[in-house]
Amino acid sequence: MAVGYASGKVILFGEHAVVYGRPAIAVPVTQVQAQAQVEDAERGQGITIVARDLKQTYKLSEAPPDDALRAIVVSTLERIRIGLEQDLTLTVSSTIPVARGLGSGAAVSTAIVRALLEHFDKWLDSRAISDLVFETEKIHHGTPSGIDNTVIAFEKPVYFVKGERMEIFWVQRPFLLVIADTGVQSPTKVAVGDVRRAWEREPVRYEELFDDIGTIAEMGRRAIEQGDIEAMGRLMNENQRLLRLLKVSSPELERLIGAARQGGALGTKLSGAGRGGNMIALVTQETCSRVSMMLRLAGARDVIVTEVS
């Protein structure tokens, strides 16, 4: 049996604006993972996909072309020049909440690629894996930025500009993030589509907002590289203010953001598409427990603490 794993991710700075060519920063979250297992099956069975979390089992040959799991299997086998006439069982599971901004779709696809590579004793570098997953991300998100597949495939903090070479950068001083789940699903495709339509109606205003968010991402990278945690917090708060102006926050997010700030967080913002999903809080060792408690009291469905280093 071959097994592939992939971690989740959060965006620190730059969501939505990254779709329009501005920079964004994202980091892996190793506390949550997707897993894919590939096993040989009985002769003549073909390729069977078992999606445990969705409680679905189906044949690859019967899946529609826009099925994301089918798409990543087909594109991976084509990339490594293996025919589809295989007898395999692919089992997928994940601890990453769906539609919460943690990159669940990209992580599942990445885990599948890695499992298939191991099963067939093939190798692809992180860039090639990222490129394969990006094509599947179009099914999940419509017009993805490419940041999810990049940070998850490379498993490093990344500074990302769409269409340009991704940069892995140095974290001068490890920092703690508390990630809190609103419990509200927020499909990226919907929020990204709404922002695009608003941009089409008011291009000048939205380009200015995207510019401001891009500047924050640039300043955020400098703060991380210099180990200036306090500056990071201020920039996160400003990024959240701009995301409100993009109309991608929500009452559930604002409730958790307020609770985290009350608990002593240095900075707070939504992470991902918004309209639900997750928020992140920058904390110290001293404030981590209190912020986590405040978030739970405010109704967070789940709270994760991760160190970025």
For every predicted segment, state its role.
Residues 102-122:
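DPxDG-like acidic metal-binding loop motif
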Residues 276:
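Glycine-rich phosphate-binding loops that contact phosphosugars or nucleotide phosphates
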Residues 77-98, 132:
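Glycine- and acidic-rich phosphate- and metal-coordinating loops
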Residues 30:
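Gly/Ser-rich catalytic/binding loops embedded in alpha/beta enzyme cores
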Residues 2-7, 11-13, 17-19, 26, ...:
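C-terminal nucleotide
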Residues 127-128:
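Short hydrophobic alpha-helices at membrane interfaces in multi-pass membrane enzymes
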